[in-house]
Amino acid sequence: MAPPLVGLGPRLDTDYSIWPLAYCQSEMPQDFFGGAIKFSNMGTIRVPMIYTLLVGGEVGGKQHVALVDCGFRNDHWAAKYGFASWEEPRDVLARVGFAPEDVEVILVTHMHFDHIGNFEAFPNAKLYIQIDEYLGWSDIVCSAHQYETEEEKAFIFSSFDPQDLVRAAQGVAEGRVHFIRGDEEVLPGITARLAKDSHTFGSQWFEVQTRNGPFAVVGDVVYWYSNIENMWPPGYHQGSAMNQLSVYRQIRETLKQKIDRVIPGHDPKIWDRHNSWLAPSGNRIAEVNLRQGDTTRKPDVSAQKIIHT
């Protein structure tokens, strides 16, 4: 049973449009995402890097524009891991009719470079981060520079950019960062759920209540649908595999076992499970849910396939 909501009082009648947006792609080993043994020796796969736009709020009330994660800058990471088709947030968001300036809130699932590394592209957005995540990375970065060898640092910094911590600290000083402590309703109908010591120190996923029922935007707590369908953690994480299994159970209970309502971090199968289309860049857009009164952004509406199971 999911913990009770805290923060904004009684549950409201809320509704959100939900668009997962790919902003680049990478060719990576399958067992990195699907897990050792089950996906060992299966070669590589092209996976999307995704952030998810949520637009809505209380029905009949103020409407919000929130982004779950914000990608990374097109800097050394692109060359290090061979990312292809990287695009500016302005071009990506424009496909569903929004601009970076419209984003009020960035809900950071965790502080890996591809999830927090481009928040400065959204000048009006406040960041929501779990305090356990911020303190965990602060501690490990300090320890790495004081005590670790270069070989030991390689794993620590394999997906974390210390400069993102510097920029986040500047955001704290400027009042742009809101720290979450555990479970908290951050916007009407959007609740942060702490997944402590799972993918990272203080990862979180977001339960989104709509008129079509709940959805879960989970970041890398669930890389692929197969992780949560088969209860099999991935091959790469900083936390505990057993803790990840507990989080999978919580998500499944929240969604009443309707796994298609999960928005995973890097699964190309999301494009097949939901109404989606291909941009000229080769990146894709999914339209998982439309709030009441909203209209599809897909150029060809005849192929509409929104799944509400």
PLM-predicted stretches and their roles:
Residues 2-46, 183-184, 206, 290-307:
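Basic, amphipathic N-terminal segments that precede the first structured/catalytic domain
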Residues 2-6, 73-76, 87-98, 102, 132-194, ...:
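Metallo-beta-lactamase
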Residues 18-20, 51-60, 179-211:
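Core dinuclear metal-dependent hydrolase active-site scaffold
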Residues 25-91, 204-220:
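Conserved beta-strand hairpin/beta-sheet module of binuclear metal-dependent hydrolase folds
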Residues 68, 109, 129-130, 217-220, ...:
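Active-site flanking residues adjacent to catalytic metal/cofactor-binding acidic residues
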Residues 83-129:
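Active-site metal-binding motif and surrounding structural segment of the metallo-beta-lactamase
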Residues 248-309:
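Binuclear metal-ion centers of metallo-dependent hydrolases, dominated by the metallo-beta-lactamase
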